[in-house]
UniProtKB/Swiss-Prot annotation:
The lineage of its organism: Bacteria, Pseudomonadati, Thermodesulfobacteriota, Syntrophia, Syntrophales. This is 6-oxocyclohex-1-ene-1-carbonyl-CoA hydrolase. Keywords: Hydrolase. SUPFAM superfamilies: ClpP/crotonase. It comes from Syntrophus aciditrophicus (strain SB). Pfam families: ECH_1 (PF00378).
Amino acid sequence: MSLDWMPREHGLKNHSRHTEQWWGTEAPCTVYEKRPLKDPKGNVVPGLYSAWIRLNNPGQYNSYTTEMVKGVIAGFENSSTDREVVAVVFTGTGPNAFCTGGNTKEYSEYYSMRPEEYGSYMELFNNMVDSILMCKKPVICRVNGMRVAGGQEIGTATDITVSSDLAIFGQAGPRHGSAPVGGASDFLPWFLSIEDAMWNCVSCEMWSAYKMKAKNLISKALPVLKDDKGNWVRNPQVYTDTYVKDGEIVYGEPKTGEEAKQARAWVNEKLKNNDYDFSLIDAEVDRIVWVFANLFPGCLMKSIDGIRQKKKFWWDQIKNDHRYWLGTNMMGEAFLGFGAFNTKKITGKDTIDFIKNRQLIAEGALVDEAFMEQVLGKPLAK
């Protein structure tokens, strides 16, 4: 018997939570666009898209301002319920940076010494991480340059990473006045060994894309530069043709001396002249999206959420506690660290005097303006 007698509604519902007010085209902003799905031959597939969320603040290495965070949230939450979207691609503008985290100028000049304000900001930041982890579409991180600090945290919240081989990865908090508790301390142990996770989280060392590929943090590291004959050139600043040297693993480690100096100059000249090509990365992103498109969407997302849940477990347990600590920290070490970094053009130094800081602590000194004056740099003579 037909069920035509049952009343049914057939118009499509709009489940989008946000309007276009959170996106823009002029830096600093978050750019949101839908790009047509293409098959392996480059043919456009009607009615299906990948959603691209791009951090657009290249003058400050794509650090996210408060308004940009809102744009990222809007992009992921709208993509999550957009029936036309197959996958989300999260990237940045230009060849230098995917994202270097929060905007230090904002942190230093506005949020430091305002713990409640920073707590409100962390509500947005936590929502941004959640919007990635909760997106009901696969999320690809297209790393176009350095993925550092908060940029590493939102990057490791994604599902798959395809990277420029010029990119570097790492944290910056303990050196500049914060702690990597916006995701890194929760996510890194799933990617790396516990000792690698510990050292990468606290040392503030920058590791190459090839080193991170070897250590399983990312899926692909691909070249973006060519020589004068049009041949692809792997990042010449790190070892890619040697795995072991004198008993030590050197693959992905930085070169030193004159060789490093020459390689750095060659890379910088290429980037200065905008002589780079992301076609290999984009082809790999397209390939991955096409794989996703040819899977059952419900089964795909159930599988992805099953993997994500491991990352989400500790993040969900302690993200609220982190919010309070980070707000309180804005009254002390964050004021010093972000302030030093933000005034480096004034003082010539981007960090405090760490040894003097520890000496004053050892003396039991009161942490007041006199204390801070002793550890911060001094304005250079004009």
